[in-house]
């Protein structure tokens, strides 16, 4: 997930009413048994939720068997169990479908299993492994593969394996014939309008959904596109996500939004130089790198990062065919704004693993060494040795910077 400093929401007002205390019948025999959290302002200690959120879970009655689809976070187990018990005796539950095992969806699972020990948890192989390390006790489990089904008597559930949306364990559950897709985190949003659980009861939440996508799914764009391909030819009349409103009006709109946000942008080769320079020395080096990289067929732009927003920086990281960082040492460390940039690397879908490093220092010079370790740890290749300058760069250092820019630029173009 993306830290709070990496995502800045542009969205809007919040309505306050009483939260939903009871269950909601979505379709005959299909119930919402989730929990509303309209006051939440930071999700998982990581990013802002101006509109709160919901933890959606569902109970499905068949002619012969009963299934629960996902649970809620552990702190809301009492409310959750009250809703379950208002519909069925827990010991009569046959299946617990775990589409995703992150604690906001599995936190109540351990307690639920105590109430229905004969129930079978249905999940992917990865989810079974994760649950073993979350529950630390035995449980009945049925591992499913792509296309497997479960029959509830007059209703059938089909499972669609979609890893890394946004954990390795994720799957969709489709209620066949009724064309309802349970997607856990995918296609949802952190949005709660208390007492209103359907998307046609609330304002358009496209901004909230985009912000949610940006914070959670942006590093997994290829996986989003693969998942959309798996359901492209299915009839879908309703999407039941784990966060935000149930999408019964125009469900394909949410899918198409996720797909559009995940598609790559192609507009020629780009090399970006990102630097910070309190005293102008690293900036002189950045100018030299840019001169060296300025060859036909490549767009080269140098950015002082203090002039850019976090969203602008993340866009640049994602679009680049090569990244060259200019980092001075300040108090034996990388300056915080540049640490933030290096942290953003894990929050986007990168198309390059080629990087360069340069920077100035006065007497210790740790910053470039730290950055080199960070980049190599993320799988980046540095085809040119790091260039460092003690205070003001000499003519020889400037020449090395120009050569760095030229060498990396030529490498980008040679890759085609």
Model-derived regions, located:
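Short, Lys/Arg-enriched N-terminal segments with co-localized hydrophobic residues
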Residues: 6-19
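Active-site metal-binding motif and surrounding structural segment of the metallo-beta-lactamase
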Residues: 75-122
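Short acidic active-site motifs
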Residues: 108, 308-313
């Amino acid at each position: 997930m993306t830290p709070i400093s990496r995502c800045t929401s542009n969205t809007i007002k919040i309505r306050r009413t009483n939260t939903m205390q009871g269950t909601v019948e979505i379709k005959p025999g299909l119930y919402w048994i989730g929990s509303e959290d309209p006051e939440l302002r930071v999700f998982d200690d990581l990013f802002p939720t101006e509109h709160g959120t919901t933890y959606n879970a569902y109970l499905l009655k068949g002619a012969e068997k009963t299934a629960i689809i996902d649970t809620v976070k552990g702190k809301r187990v009492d409310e959750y169990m009250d809703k379950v018990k208002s519909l069925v005796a827990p010991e009569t539950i046959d299946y617990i479908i775990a589409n995703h095992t992150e604690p906001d969806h599995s936190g109540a699972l351990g307690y639920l299993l105590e109430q229905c020990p004969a129930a079978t948890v249905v999940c992917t192989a990865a989810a079974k492994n994760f649950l073993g390390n979350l529950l630390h006790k035995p449980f009945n489990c049925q591992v499913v593969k792509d296309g497997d089904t479960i029959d509830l008597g007059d209703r059938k559930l089909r499972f669609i394996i979609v890893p890394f949306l946004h954990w390795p364990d994720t799957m969709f559950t489709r209620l066949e014939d009724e064309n309802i897709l349970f997607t856990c985190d995918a296609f949802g949003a952190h949005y709660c309008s208390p007492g209103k659980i359907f998307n046609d009861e609330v304002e358009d939440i496209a901004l909230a959904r985009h912000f949610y996508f940006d914070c959670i799914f942006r590093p997994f764009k290829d996986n989003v596109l693969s998942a959309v391909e798996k359901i492209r030819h299915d009839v879908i009349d309703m999407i039941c996500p784990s966060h935000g409103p149930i999408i019964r009006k125009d469900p394909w709109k949410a899918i198409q939004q996720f797909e559009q946000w995940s598609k790559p942008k192609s507009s020629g080769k780009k090399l970006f130089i990102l630097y910070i320079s309190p005293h102008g020395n690293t900036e002189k080096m950045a100018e030299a790198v840019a001169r060296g990289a300025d060859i036909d067929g490549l767009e080269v732009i140098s950015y002082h990062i203090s002039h850019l927003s976090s969203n602008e920086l993340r866009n640049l990281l994602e679009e680049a065919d090569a990244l060259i960082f200019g980092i001075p040492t300040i108090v034996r460390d990388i300056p915080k704004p540049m640490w933030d940039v290096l942290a953003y690397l894990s929050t986007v879908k990168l198309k390059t693993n080629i990087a360069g490093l340069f920077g100035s220092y006065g007497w210790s010079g740790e910053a470039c060494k730290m950055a080199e370790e960070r980049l190599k740890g993320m799988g980046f290749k540095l085809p040119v040795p790091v260039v460092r300058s003690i205070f003001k760069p000499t003519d020889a250092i400037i020449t090395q910077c120009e050569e760095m820019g030229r060498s990396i630029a030529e490498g980008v173009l040679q890759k085609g």
